[in-house]
Curated annotation (Swiss-Prot):
Subcellular location: Nucleus
Source species: Arabidopsis thaliana
Record's GO cellular component terms: nucleus
Family statement: Belongs to the PRP39 family.
Chain intervals with Low complexity compositional bias: 670-688
Protein's UniProt keywords contain tRNA processing: no
Ranges of biased composition (kind: Polar residues): 297-313
Key words of the record: mRNA processing, mRNA splicing, Nucleus, Repeat
InterPro entries: HAT, TPR-like_helical_dom_sf
Spans annotated as Disordered: 278-314, 668-688
Protein name according to UniProt: Pre-mRNA-processing factor 39-1
Amino acid sequence: MGDSEAMVSEGYTSAPYGDYNASAATVESTGQETAPIVDASHSVNNDSLVNGTAPVENGSATDNVAVTAPAAEHGDNTGSTLSTEEERLWNIVRANSLEFNAWTALIDETERIAQDNIAKIRKVYDAFLAEFPLCYGYWKKFADHEARVGAMDKVVEVYERAVLGVTYSVDIWLHYCTFAINTYGDPETIRRLFERALVYVGTDFLSSPLWDKYIEYEYMQQDWSRVALIYTRILENPIQNLDRYFSSFKELAETRPLSELRSAEESAAAAVAVAGDASESAASESGEKADEGRSQVDGSTEQSPKLESASSTEPEELKKYVGIREAMYIKSKEFESKIIGYEMAIRRPYFHVRPLNVAELENWHNYLDFIERDGDFNKVVKLYERCVVTCANYPEYWIRYVTNMEASGSADLAENALARATQVFVKKQPEIHLFAARLKEQNGDIAGARAAYQLVHSEISPGLLEAVIKHANMEYRLGNLDDAFSLYEQVIAVEKGKEHSTILPLLYAQYSRFSYLVSRDAEKARRIIVEALDHVQPSKPLMEALIHFEAIQPPPREIDYLEPLVEKVIKPDADAQNIASSTEREELSLIYIEFLGIFGDVKSIKKAEDQHVKLFYPHRSTSELKKRSADDFLASDRTKMAKTYNGTPPAQPVSNAYPNAQAQWSGGYAAQPQTWPPAQAAPAQPQQWNPAYGQQAAYGAYGGYPAGYTAPQAPTPVPQAAAYGAYPAQTYPTQSYAPPVAAAAPAAAPVQQPAAAVAPQAYYNTYY
């Protein structure tokens, strides 16, 4: 067997998951193998791959999660000159390695002008697939380029890297097996490759094309026992087209003798059973008269009882043989009926940079919920692996995967999934790194937690308030109060150096609050706010923090100090930059009025209410004012309070704007608990899955990207009026990263209910 054949048969590495893979194999059909461990000698020309510098399959050892061997740098070092367009596109992807459209344009341009320069083609594919290893169509194109120049060992190398990068793709395994059939003559080499593939994707609901190719190959070999065994294995799994497979199996059983359908092991077991039956029959006849066993006088012979028995039981054996498979089929169909709705709602079962729609995202959560309840760990792992191919750009699914594996006691799987998420698939999204930091802290890896926070501070999203708060809180939990204070001060110093910082007021406010909560040093907390007012214009978040701070202090309250600062924010000033929106100004005015309602006097309350009416009531829209019918003016306050809230509160006189005066700040000024995952929405209606997926062209799934496609931006939270009783309601400002959002559902999909408006996070929120 040649080197390339050895790689095809056995791959570069052992199968992923360690002990898990052995258990996974036991639930596969009879005869299915795990991917075997490879000896270094099988990859003479690929030592780096064998020795661990190459990628490994999804879910393998956590110390190696690279999924392709990228170029040393983005650029050309092949000795050839770049065209102007190539240079332009390389500059784009160097600046932003996630610019998918620029990458595909660069590949097209390189293929156009460098058809015979395989080194340049390798360079661009290596670099692209290092960023987007799940694009199976581009692995196929890469392999085709290597085949075109006759480098068969390189073709195998590309396919091996491909199945390491997108292990749970039916399509890439199908392309690899097809290549092996067309290239190698040794049936055992090809069969071992099929068996490697089926370990990972044999139970995939959409695995029919791969099973069909395997059946087709064995039909060409006319190895009917292997064909029958493949059908048997298929019928054990609830996959697509089960009815067709069962019908084909019955047709095979009707047209071939049972002796051809049974494997050697099955034939041996049947022979033992027949021999046992014959022995029992002989023992029962031993007491019969001797003359009953003689030949008749006329010389005629009797048919052997054993042969007669064998002849009469063959149809029964065939019926039993088929009946066992039919029972498998019925059981699989029963489970299929439970999952078919989820499977049909998966409109895009492969990776794509375009966002998924809301219905598909919800369907994945619902499907995972169902499989987790079913309790089959192997099914859970494989569905998660399918999910994080389709939903690779969504941190919530990686977080859920890691959390589930942790809860199941599978720390290695959790660690590996987290490494893939943070190092490859969502490496530029801060929430995955914040989750990683918390998980590492829980597991005692304090240095790793600090490194995760530092990565966010320095590279992923510098100045992200959530990261600062969580990092400082961790240092406080560890007893490093000075380090927590220092962290706030360092970030504040950086933000002060910026010409326009959107988070500086929030940083000051949070630092003041944190300082007071952990040290009860009221003077220091007040100094922080006062210092803030020396560096930034008074703003809603800063004023909220100051009002709240005064509210929790013992008398006397510094109302005279607060009043001009609040007025500076809520009064529009043509000569000064207005940093607060009209909604923010009105909300702050209401908060201040409620504060005065408790701690002020009648005179100060009246002044604030009159000012509120003057500033905000004349600007209400005519349509809003029309909502106040004559009955609203005549009805008593109690009647108004009893009216059903319909989500659009009518304008009210200022005197009636605070019905919940007793509902003050939350007790103990404490953060509210936070749980993950969030409550799931109602199950989405199943959508018709596109049946053409299984026969897609190798590259077609990646075509049709709109020109100028860019990653979608996070939606701006809907402003929410903040009653002071629920103080304070505040969102963090929009910062530099944009997590993936759901795409609009296509026209053919069922009409989705509009998502509820996202309430702004409370200023004093749930960060731990």
